[in-house]
From Swiss-Prot:
This is Resistance to inhibitors of cholinesterase protein 3. It is a multi-pass membrane protein. GO terms for molecular function: protein folding chaperone. GO terms for cellular component: endoplasmic reticulum membrane; intracellular membrane-bounded organelle; neuron projection; neuronal cell body; synapse. Keywords: Endoplasmic reticulum, Membrane, Transmembrane, Transmembrane helix. GO terms for biological process: positive regulation of synaptic transmission, cholinergic; protein localization to cell surface; regulation of muscle contraction; synaptic transmission, cholinergic. The chain crosses the membrane at residues 39-59, 127-147. Residues 1-13, 362-374 have a biased composition (Basic and acidic residues). Its main location: endoplasmic reticulum. InterPro entries: Ric3 (IPR026160), RIC3_N (IPR032763). Required for maturation and cell surface expression of acetylcholine receptors. Pfam families: RIC3. Residues 1-31, 72-105, 157-176, 269-385 are annotated as: Disordered.
Length: 385
């Protein structure tokens, strides 16, 4: 096992070194392409452009700033020989460009010369406008390449710094674990780790059994085993326990006890919830019975009202006299002060109806509405606890 771990570490280190070398070569190639002949070419183009623009653009600008006006030299056409003034014919008209007008020249030739001069002037103007734009673009490209090369150099320095830190950490780990410990100590540590893994697997199995509820854990037996191990040094050596492992086992025992207490509390809460559900179901049944009784009373009243509606209206007074005791019997069932007031109001209305001889249908409707209101009030009352 230790040999395999050492080999794996060596492989990882070699892979890291290869990656670093590849990155460094890539950066070097990119930087070399930017900082080599390309920079020289850009500088040469800038110098040529400046030399071409100086006499036509920069020199007149400098002279204008300094306050000197450069007079243009008279241009002489080299194709034609100079003509004597006496050959021109007295005080005739002169050419606007400083040339004497020749009568022997055809007008078409004069037009062609004027067009050629205009085209040459236009081409020169375009050339003078395009060259400064080109120089500005080249300068911007040069600045961009310079800044880019500086940024890459800074990134490369950061990478080298982090790589050096990783190398130092690897060397420290080697000195801590590889240099100090020998093979025997490593084997002993591996055996102890295996023993702790076995103990953990057993504890997990016991926890699963506790959750299932089939095989509860015997904590007394675990305490006895711990005491025996503390007393017998030979048993400790055989099992390979250390102080850290003993503390770990004690912590696990405490956790098991807490788990049992939590499971008991959970069972108690379950029982309480079941009892509450039973009590709530009983209360609901009582409420349903009360509602059924009220519905039966309302159905009886509706039947009585239908029978009264079938009787003729002439016997209105007699029906009212027969209806009074039934109304009084229903209203006596009410216990609150509001119900007593309603009975008084109903009695007064009945007396008024007897005196005036009003129909009974209106009174029956009012009575049905009152019963509905009473039913709603009973439902809104708080439940008995």
């Amino acid at each position: 096992m230790p040999k395999l771990t050492d080999r794996n570490r060596d492989r990882d280190r070699e892979k890291k070194k290869r990656r670093r070398r590849d990155d460094s070569y890539d950066d070097y190639e990119e930087e070399g392409g930017i900082s080599g002949w390309k920079l020289g070419l850009v500088v040469g183009v800038i110098v040529v452009c400046f030399a071409m623009l100086y006499p036509t653009l920069f020199h007149p600008m400098l002279m204008g700033f300094l306050g000197r006006s450069s007079q243009p030299a008279p241009s002489i056409n080299q194709q034609r020989p100079p003509i004597h003034p006496a050959m021109g014919g007295g005080g005739g008209q002169r050419h606007p460009g400083g040339y004497p007008s020749r009568p022997d020249v055809h007008p078409a030739m004069r037009m062609a010369q004027a067009q050629a001069e205009g085209q040459s002037g236009g081409s020169k103007g375009m050339f003078t406008w395009m060259l400064p734009i080109y120089t500005i673009g080249v300068v911007l490209f040069l600045l961009y390449t310079l800044f880019k090369s500086k940024g890459k150099k800074a990134k490369r320095k950061k990478r080298n710094y982090f790589d050096s830190e990783d190398d130092s950490e690897d060397s420290e780990m080697e000195t801590k674990y590889g240099g100090k410990f020998g093979k025997k100590k490593l084997k002993g540590l591996q055996e102890r780790l295996r023993q702790t893994e076995d103990a953990m697997s057993k504890i997990l199995e016991q926890l699963e059994s506790v959750q299932a509820g089939a095989n509860p854990v015997d904590l007394d037996a675990a305490d006895k085993l711990a005491l025996e191990l503390e007393e017998d040094k030979s048993a400790k050596e055989a099992v390979g326990l250390t102080e850290t492992n003993e503390q770990y086992i004690k912590d696990l025992e405490v956790a098991l006890k807490e788990f049992q207490s939590l499971s008991k509390a959970y069972d108690k809460e379950k029982m309480k919830k079941l009892k509450r559900k039973d009590s709530s179901s009983e209360e609901e049944e009582e409420e349903e019975e009360e509602e059924e009784e009220e519905e039966e009373e309302l159905s009886e009243l509706s039947e009585v009202e239908e029978e009264e509606e079938e009787k003729p209206v002439k016997k209105g007074k007699k029906v009212v006299d027969q209806k009074k005791p039934a109304k009084k019997a229903i209203l006596r069932q009410k216990s609150t002060s509001e119900e007593e007031e309603e009975t008084r109001i109903a009695d007064k209305k009945a007396e008024e109806e007897e005196e005036e001889g009003i129909d009974i249908d209106f009174e029956i409707r009012e009575h049905a509405e009152r019963n509905k209101k009473d039913k709603n009030l009973r439902r809104r009352r708080p439940k008995k606890t």
